[in-house]
């Protein structure tokens, strides 16, 4: 039966949207009215255009198990097979649907983790699998406050770029949990399609809070097998393109919205220092990675 009561949890994040969860038989899960427009190169997510009511809309699905329809009248319908857990559905809504519907409303949402340093934020950006969650956890264990590990809303106030998490979270692979966190930490499953675990750690609930000024952004490059930590400043053009590539979109093919994201990325690239950091994926080297990032931020403050 459909459920629309938001109660508590992930549905409360969809403040002005009507969200329905519909557990349907398999044959009713995928109505044949979709045209695929985008495939995620890092996972099974597919975004399609749909037209079930003559008004258009989008369907985001994860294989044949979950399909979420986003309608233009601020209505979301999530359909899923009976064997799919509510935990998986909630993760898909928070991880993929929420950032994309916010982006469709004109917000600039980055696929990025962040930690708080003093009164500002350091953003750690990169594609899925680059180690954002591992690095923000390492910073958190070293004394900086974790803001979130996946999606950041970027906004402006008096010419200053600020960041706040779309939703507070920390998800890690088992080997990172074992290497970085104490044995007493509590974890729960995230979704059947990922090996990551949700980690119960203190993450400030910043929903509604004032965004923190962004001190710098660090793009995590592909890992190197051996060698020292490398850090280089990105040109404005390089930074702009990296920001565009790391931004969420409900319709990645929408030219008008793409122009808006490009304008947001260009403004951010011109006003916030951005660096590429490259290092071996070795937990023992994370202190050196943190030191390089903090030294660069300190140098910016004294420049």
Language model segments and positions:
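Long, basic/Gly/Ser/Thr-rich N-terminal segments
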Residues: 1-84, 293-303
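Conserved lysine of the Walker
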Residues: 132
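Aromatic pocket-lining residues of Rossmann-like dinucleotide-binding sites
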Residues: 139
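Acidic side chains
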Residues: 18, 22, 95, 149-150
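A broad, low-specificity signal for short, low-complexity segments enriched in glycine/proline
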Residues: 37-40, 75-78, 83-87, 107-108, ...
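Extreme N-terminal, non-catalytic leader segments
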Residues: 61-67, 71-118
């Amino acid at each position: 039966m459909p459920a629309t009561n938001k109660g508590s949890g992930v549905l409360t994040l969809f403040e002005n949207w009507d969200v329905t969860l519909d557990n349907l038989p398999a044959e009713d899960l995928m109505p044949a009215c979709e045209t695929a427009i985008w495939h995620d190169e890092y996972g099974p997510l597919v975004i399609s255009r749909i037209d079930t009511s003559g008004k258009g809309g989008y369907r985001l699905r994860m294989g044949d198990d979950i399909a979420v329809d986003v309608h233009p009248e601020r209505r979301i319908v999530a359909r899923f097979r009976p064997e799919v857990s509510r935990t998986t559905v909630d993760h898909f809504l928070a991880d993929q649907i929420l950032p994309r519907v916010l982006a469709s409303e004109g917000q600039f949402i980055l696929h990025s983790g962040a930690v708080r340093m003093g009164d500002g934020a350091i953003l750690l950006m990169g594609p899925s699998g680059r180690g954002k969650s591992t690095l923000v956890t390492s910073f958190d264990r070293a004394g900086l406050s974790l803001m979130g590990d996946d999606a950041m809303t970027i906004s402006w106030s008096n010419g200053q770029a600020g960041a706040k998490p779309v939703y507070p979270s920390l998800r890690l692979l088992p080997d990172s949990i074992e290497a970085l966190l104490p044995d007493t930490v509590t974890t729960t499953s995230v979704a059947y399609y990922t090996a990551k675990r949700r980690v119960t750690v203190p993450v400030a609930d910043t929903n509604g809070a004032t965004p923190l000024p962004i001190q710098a952004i660090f793009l995590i490059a592909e890992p190197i097998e051996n060698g020292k930590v490398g850090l280089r400043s990105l040109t404005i053009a390089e930074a702009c393109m990296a920001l565009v590539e790391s931004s969420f979109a409900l319709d990645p093919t929408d030219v008008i919205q793409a122009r808006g994201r490009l304008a947001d990325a260009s403004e951010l690239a011109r006003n916030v220092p951005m660096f590429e950091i490259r290092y071996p994926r070795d937990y023992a080297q994370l202190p050196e990675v943190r030191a390089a990032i903090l030294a660069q931020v300190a140098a910016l403050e004294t420049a």
